[in-house]
A protein has these predicted regions:
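Structure-specific DNA junction-binding interface
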Residues: 1-120, 142, 175-176, 183-187
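Phosphate/ATP-binding catalytic cores across multiple sugar-kinase/actin-like superfamilies
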Residues: 122-140
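Phosphate-backbone recognition surface of nucleic-acid-processing proteins
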Residues: 158-195
Length: 195
């Protein structure tokens, strides 16, 4: 083997050993968790802000429905209710009589609608990341995924820092994966043990 072939071989080995599919799965899982935190904060901000305009729908059962109402509905124009889906119409119909919210027009309403559009895009990104995570989990650990489902299989792989390490862990260690904080509290402060 000459020097160039040897270097190419080493580069190939390094490339394959540095980043594994498990790394991509781990990043996807962490991205979903972080995106959930961000989405919760942003959605709460939107509901607080939009409740100035339409406080009656603040406690919608589904976020997608709420975002649709924010994007489309205008309480000063009843025709906008016709553009809503059935679920969103039902939510708007819960408002008895005239809304007690303030009148918001122009740029103020426009920015709320744009906020809802961007938030919806983030929910779509989260959905894409979930699909990718599920695909990767099935690719990496089909048997584990079949037994536990994609989300839980991913969490186990991520918490154990790899599928190979997970395979070598004793059952007692697997039981407390993700419950380190609860186990520490139990051992130091005599609280209830993690289940």
């Amino acid at each position: 083997m000459d020097r160039k072939e040897l270097l190419d071989s080493i580069k190939h080995q390094l490339r394959n050993s540095v980043y594994t599919d498990e790394d991509f799965l781990q990043h996807a899982s962490h991205s979903i968790d972080e995106l959930d935190e961000v989405l919760n904060i942003l959605f709460e901000r939107l509901t607080n802000w939009y409740s100035i305009y339409l406080p009656e729908i603040q406690h919608a059962d589904r976020r997608e429905t709420y975002l649709e109402v924010v994007q489309i509905y205008d309480k000063t124009d009843p025709k906008t209710a016709e553009k809503l889906s059935e679920r969103a119409k039902a939510l708007v119909d819960t408002i008895e009589g005239e809304s007690i919210g303030s009148v918001i027009e122009g740029k103020d309403l426009e920015i709320l609608r744009e906020y809802a559009v961007k938030l919806k895009k983030l929910y779509e990104l989260r959905s894409q990341l979930e699909s990718y995570r599920d695909y990767k989990a099935k690719e990496i650990a089909p048997n584990l995924t079949h037994l536990l489902g994609e989300a839980l299989a991913t969490k186990l792989i991520v918490y154990s820092k790899g599928l190979k390490r997970l395979a070598h862990l004793p059952a007692s260690s697997i039981q407390v994966l993700g419950a380190e904080k609860a186990l520490f509290m139990h051992l130091t402060k005599k609280t209830k043990p993690p289940k």
